[in-house]
Amino acid sequence: MALPFQLGFQDATSPIMEELLHFHDHTLMIVFMISSLVLYLISSMLTTRLTHTSTMDAQEVETIWTILPAIILITIALPSLRILYMMDEINNPSMTIKTMGHQWYWSYEYTDYSELCFDSYMIPTSDLKSGGLRLLEVDNRVVIPMEMTVRMLISSEDVLHSWAVPSLGLKTDAIPGRLNQTTLLSTRPGLYYGQCSEICGSNHSFMPIVLEMVTLNCFEKWSTSML
């Protein structure tokens, strides 16, 4: 989860988020190198007194500044396309969970179980227990087995919402009349927090998401107790 004064991303909990972090560092390094070169050229032009007035054209320079940006764009585009395909690829999910956005709460349905469904509301600050996180705790967490591929089907009953969990690298729009899907895979147990990331009305800020990643045995016990 996010911490006060945090400057970087949240710790990655899924292979997709790890790839996104690597891509961010890769792109940031390219931006840093370009910025350093531009600053060096600007400082050189401001500090040197030497001028070159006899050159009417410079084909070599023009060739370089045409080819070099193309190479840079390719080095950014290829890993980006790879991650996009990874995010869209869903192969043999172990479980499917349907998520519906409402004003202003989420409802979940485990489609592999006949009657396992519930609504998830934010716990008001006045009802928080000791150690609870303000505006992030919910009355019903989404319990998911770790190290298993889970397909999330996401839609909305009323207006546009967006189901987002940063530590898993997930952000999928919930659109009325349309069913979007994404996949998640957690590499370790724990609680992972997210929020609605699309302005959806006056209580938009009060639609938290809490995923509880547990072992398969714990999930089976929980699902049995909920049925």
Curated annotation (Swiss-Prot):
The keyword Metal-binding applies. It catalyses: 4 Fe(II)-[cytochrome c] + O2 + 8 H(+)(in) = 4 Fe(III)-[cytochrome c] + 2 H2O + 4 H(+)(out). One of its GO terms (biological process) is ATP synthesis coupled electron transport. Keywords: Copper, Electron transport, Magnesium, Membrane, Metal-binding, Mitochondrion, Mitochondrion inner membrane, Respiratory chain, Translocase, Transmembrane, Transmembrane helix, Transport. It is an enzyme of class 7 (translocase). The chain crosses the membrane at residues 15-45, 60-87. It comes from the Eukaryota. This is Cytochrome c oxidase subunit 2.
